[in-house]
Amino acid sequence: MNVSNNSNMDHNDLAKRGESLIRKSTNRYLTTVRIAFRAKQRRFDDFDGLLEESAIKPVQRSIIELSDEQDQPDLLPG
């Protein structure tokens, strides 16, 4: 999935990723809070100029990132 271009983003894929995060979690509330916290971090990173300008919204980006982390834990450092 191309994260940098909003026109290429498949909203059905985004919905499936969000549902997958909720379904695989043990606590739906904490998962929702993690998504919101990650989105808030991305939003402030965008304001600080730490991230390149992106057409994708912070909540959408956080769902994609958390879904990728959940589905591919071997890609995480550490």
Curated annotation (Swiss-Prot):
Stated role: Promotes RNA polymerase assembly. Latches the N- and C-terminal regions of the beta' subunit thereby facilitating its interaction with the beta and alpha subunits.
Taxonomic placement: Bacteria, Bacillati, Cyanobacteriota, Cyanophyceae, Synechococcales
Entries under InterPro entries matching the protein: DNA-dir_RNA_pol_omega, Pol_omega/Rpo6/RPB6
Record-listed E.C. numbers: 2.7.7.6
Single GO biological process annotation from the record: DNA-templated transcription
Taxonomic source organism: Prochlorococcus marinus subsp. pastoris (strain CCMP1986 / NIES-2087 / MED4)
Family from the record: Belongs to the RNA polymerase subunit omega family.
Keyword GTP-binding: no
Catalytic activity: RNA(n) + a ribonucleoside 5'-triphosphate = RNA(n+1) + diphosphate
UniProt keyword terms in alphabetical order: DNA-directed RNA polymerase, Nucleotidyltransferase, Transcription, Transferase
Keyword Manganese among record annotations: no
Stretch forming the signal peptide: none
Protein name per its UniProtKB record: DNA-directed RNA polymerase subunit omega
GO molecular function: DNA binding; DNA-directed RNA polymerase activity
Top-level taxon of origin: Bacteria
GO cellular component: a single term: DNA-directed RNA polymerase complex
Name of the coding gene: rpoZ
Pfam family, one: RNA_pol_Rpb6
Oligomeric and partner information: In cyanobacteria the RNAP catalytic core is composed of 2 alpha, 1 beta, 1 beta', 1 gamma and 1 omega subunit. When a sigma factor is associated with the core the holoenzyme is formed, which can initiate transcription.
